[in-house]
Amino acid sequence: MSLIHSEKYVVLYNPISNEGHLDSWHVLFIKMLTQAGFKIIALTSDPIALRKKLYDVDQTVGSTSAQALGQGLIVLGAEPVGLVQKFGRRLSHYSTKTLDVLFGRPKRRVTHLEPSMLGQQLNALLVRYPEKIGLVLNMYMDAYDPAPEQWKHFRLKTVVPLAGVCITPQSGYSEGYYGLPFYRGTCFLDDTWREAYQAKFTEKYFEYLPDVTDTRLPKTPSALLQQILTFARDRKIVFMGGSIGKQKNLTRWHQVIAASDLEQWCFVQIGRINRNNLTEGDEKSLTLQARQPRENLFVHDGYVEDERIFNEIISHSHIIFAVYRDFTRSSNMLSKAAYFEKPIVVSTEGVMGKRVNQYKIGLCVNPDMTQEIVNGLSTIEQIANLQDNFRLYRNDFSLEMVQAKLVRFIEQSVGTLG
């Protein structure tokens, strides 16, 4: 059974909105699948933001017109089911928080979403659109508690194929959702993971998706870019951005800034700082920066909702800093580097180091060696054949390739439902 030009919908669910990577991919997936002939229900916790990203001022998204999108696209908000449940959850959250304060309990950090919530949201959708859902693709299976007991009682009112995207597998093949007979498979951003999981779960279907990115630019220069260019003057701009937590290696970033020539280099940091996810060294660096702001560091501590502005800043930078700590997976920053032809400096570890070494689009450095990173900034633009290297990377990590793989994955997932 094919869902292309079918009356049934593919549900694309992004469970965590206002996170750059996922928001970007949600829009790209909608565009790709609509162009391929699928009808889409886009489920999100922030439908207003998604609509804003989909429909530009000129009412186009890429080469897909707003009219074409409207004919095959429904955008819905994912909300708790029912007013009583909403009230109960809010009351429970308030009570727990109040008791924690009164009795001095340590703060509880939520690390995963509950599979039961996913089940409630999907069942509400199945009731609203009976016999109209052909497949559900969850954009971030990493977000859910992988423990088998959490998935033991997961049920859907109507059995439909369920599949997902997994950015960072963490459970050693023990994710509970693989025990669901209607869970058909997973897309990974690393082919090594695809091969490993396919060997483990031969009855499921797995696909590798190149980590591509939105590369659109605004029609007119943004106010944020103007501020940065004024601040930078004639200095070379080193860009670091995205959701900023401990993996961004803030401690080393600040040390590199301190060790660099004030008159030659300007460092630009764009993105919301996740202060609940920093190392002690990161916190000390931020405290020092607040007390003694560096003359060569521009900081925008906030989520840039319009990715075109994020891209615009990269396009005016000279080098991308992505020397992440304990970060083994892919990053769409590599695709941004290749598309905007900006050499990127990364850590030697993980998928990013492997790809930069393979395609020669930047340098790999030790994430703990400040001087090695500083030296790399001075030599990175001397890499031979950089433009050809960028072109090769773009060919292998193209939107067309992702679209073909995604379509194949969906068709296979539907076709293999027993």
Task: State where each predicted segment sits.
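Conserved donor-binding/catalytic core segment of Leloir-type glycosyltransferases
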Residues: V11, I228-K248, H254-I257, F267-V268
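Glycosyltransferase donor-sugar binding loop
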Residues: I48, G241, C266-K284, V299-Y303
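Donor nucleotide-sugar binding/catalytic pocket of nucleotide-sugar-dependent glycosyltransferases
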Residues: P161-G172, P181-L224
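Short hydrophobic beta-strand element within catalytic cores of glycosyltransferases
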Residues: I319-I320, E341-S347
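Acidic donor-binding loop of glycosyltransferase active sites
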Residues: E312-R329
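A charged, aromatic-enriched C-terminal amphipathic alpha-helix characteristic of glycosyltransferases
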Residues: H21, D368, E381-G415
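A short, glycine/small-residue-rich beta-strand->loop->alpha-helix junction that serves as a flexible
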Residues: Y13-V27, Y144-D145, K248, T328
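Nucleotide-activated donor-binding/catalytic signature segment of Leloir-type glycosyltransferases, i.e.
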Residues: E280-E312, H316
